[in-house]
A protein has these predicted regions:
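Phosphate-group recognition and catalysis centered on beta-loop-alpha active-site segments
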Residues: 1-155
Length: 155
């Protein structure tokens, strides 16, 4: 089972560090895949959940493509990735219960049914206090992956 660090978070949300290149690199170095928020502005890529915050070179994305789950935050980035000859793993969604990634995984909104090809997203939303207060939390191992702010606590 893959564990995906949401915006680079491992032991809880850290808004000041999320989507920063160094933060993402640390999560990858820790053995995790990472979900990142990508936007395109003036033919350049930026990371940032609500707005373009951190410039990211295409070469950086290519080098780490096997560890990244790219959440396209606008049409421009979605269009560029969908036409790229490089085999990136990317997706776009807003409030969908399910979204299919470019590699065929089912990005699954919290609380929805899932299967062995699903990525369960943010399971902690149903028990946040327990997640925050425990050093280790168990998770369901019957999905392909879990994307969470707390992957470092999962056993």
């Amino acid at each position: 089972m893959k564990l995906i660090a949401h915006r680079g978070n491992i032991v809880g949300p850290n808004p000041l560090e999320e989507n920063k290149l160094e933060y993402i690199e640390a999560a990858i170095a820790g053995g995790y895949d990472v979900e990142i928020d990508v936007r395109c502005e003036d033919h350049q890529f930026y990371l940032g959940h609500d707005e373009p915050q951190y410039y990211v070179p295409m070469t950086w994305l290519v080098k780490r493509k096997d560890k990244l789950w790219i959440h396209c935050k606008d049409f421009k980035s979605l269009n560029i990735f969908s036409n790229s000859p490089i085999d990136f793993n990317f997706f776009w969604h807003e409030n969908d219960k399910y979204t299919l990634t470019s590699k065929g995984y089912i990005w699954t909104y919290p609380g929805q049914s899932y299967c062995s090809n699903s990525v369960i997203v943010m399971p902690e939303v149903f028990d946040l206090q327990n997640t925050q207060n425990n050093d280790k939390i168990s998770y369901n191992k019957k999905s392909f992956a879990i994307c969470s702010d707390y992957v470092g606590k999962m056993i």
